[in-house]
């Protein structure tokens, strides 16, 4: 008991997370470890086709990587796999962010002595944590944050950007609705800039009030005007003092 470990490959879309997971699967298989790959039921992007990596294919019947047929289990909740993991040494889970019970069963299985290797996103296209990731991350022994390539300028990319206007947190898609971007590209959209700065200033105002025992209440319209007039480069204290009701 309590001898397992949790390893997590993360980063933006198109950052090679699943490739790292699959390579580990093959290495562990060669070492005669009993391996199980768990995939998310509703992620059917790659059914009967080749993924980002031409070595990797998924059909409704099997998962193949570098000509190795993998032991796979497809489910919507990790609880569905709880009865079968005892037959395996190492559990691999792809797209971990989609499993609502991820933090519960990753911890449970690691406590049972299983090594757990994960691949997936930490944050949404709005750079907010996926539901449950705040509970999972503190349980992990090792995290690798991989980068992708910004499609706009070739720089290292650490953020995922959605290219349509849908605001739902979970929309499963590929390069038809997502792209990997660097910080500069992420902030090229004025709506994104204003939204993020408003959130930062609001949080800063709460901290400032707590620190100074004050009760400043921000006028959002004034804050927007202040942000734009100062071209996003300003002293936050000046902003909250000039833009309170």
Segments from the language model and where they lie:
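Conserved P-loop
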Residues: 2-78, 125-132, 180, 187, ...
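Structural motif
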Residues: 8, 90-92, 117
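Short amphipathic alpha-helix with an adjacent loop that forms part of the alpha/beta core around
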Residues: 78-85
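Conserved P-loop NTPase "ATPase switch" module shared by AAA+ and STAND
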Residues: 87-99
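Charge-rich, solvent-exposed alpha-helical interaction surfaces
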Residues: 200-207, 222, 226-227, 236-239
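Charged, low-complexity interaction regions
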Residues: 210-218
């Amino acid at each position: 008991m309590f001898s397992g470990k949790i390893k997590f490959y993360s980063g933006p879309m198109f950052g090679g997370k699943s490739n790292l997971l699959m390579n580990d699967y093959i290495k562990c298989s060669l070492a005669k470890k009993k391996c199980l790959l768990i995939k998310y039921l509703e992620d059917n992007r790659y059914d009967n086709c080749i993924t980002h990596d031409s070595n990797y294919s998924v059909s409704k019947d099997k998962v193949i990587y570098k000509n190795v047929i993998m032991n796979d289990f497809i489910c919507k909740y990790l609880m569905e796999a709880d009865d079968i993991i005892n037959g395996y040494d190492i559990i691999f889970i792809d797209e971990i962010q989609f499993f609502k019970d991820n933090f519960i069963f990753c911890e449970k299985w690691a406590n049972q002595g299983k090594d757990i290797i994960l691949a997936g996103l930490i944050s949404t296209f709005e750079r907010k944590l996926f539901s449950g990731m705040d509970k999972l991350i503190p349980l992990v022994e090792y995290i690798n944050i991989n980068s992708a390539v910004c499609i706009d300028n070739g720089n290292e990319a650490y953020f995922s950007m959605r290219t349509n206007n849908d605001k739902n947190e979970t929309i499963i898609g590929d390069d038809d609705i997502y792209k990997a971007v660097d910080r500069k590209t992420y902030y090229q959209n004025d709506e994104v800039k204003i939204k993020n700065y408003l959130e930062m200033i609001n949080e800063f105002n709460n901290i400032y009030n707590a620190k100074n025992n004050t009760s400043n209440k921000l006028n959002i319209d004034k804050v927007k005007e202040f942000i734009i007039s100062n071209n996003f480069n300003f002293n936050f204290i000046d902003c909250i003092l000039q833009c309170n009701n």
